[in-house]
Amino acid sequence: MYCYIIKESSEIPLKSHRTRPRFEKRLLNNIEYALKKEGIVDYDITMREGVITIKSSDDKVGDVVRNVFGVHKVCKALCMEFNSINDIISKAEEIFKDHVIGKKFAVRVKRAGTHTFTSLDIAAKVGEALLKYSAGVNLSNPDVIINIEVRDNVVYYILKCWDGV
């Protein structure tokens, strides 16, 4: 099962505290309508802090949602709960080792919530784990960028991103 992380248009967060929930609810309704119109019924949709997350096993979700007005970006990710930074590192190595073979790479991490580690800690340790499979690290001009997002106790390993319309 994949998780799709949807970032809303930059106009929505600028709305007042009374108007913003209305726009966000409309965006959620539009996304659900688009999914149902395409025959996608197996999904779970949640919204938290301006980020919409859809869990679904259907591969068409990203292509459908990116065409909904108000969607800025859609990212397809593998998601899992974790107990420690070691869980994040071992799964990242398993997922991304084939992506970096013979290429220079960089690891980019975004983090939200309270943790005993920083984004840089994750990036450094994942980079260290992937280094043996790659041609090296190049932070300014990498061949491959490994994107990871951590929100509370869930880690998202970004596989692909689409810009919205």
Where are these regions (language model features)?
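RNA-binding accessory domains that recognize and position tRNA/RNA substrates
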Residues: 1-165
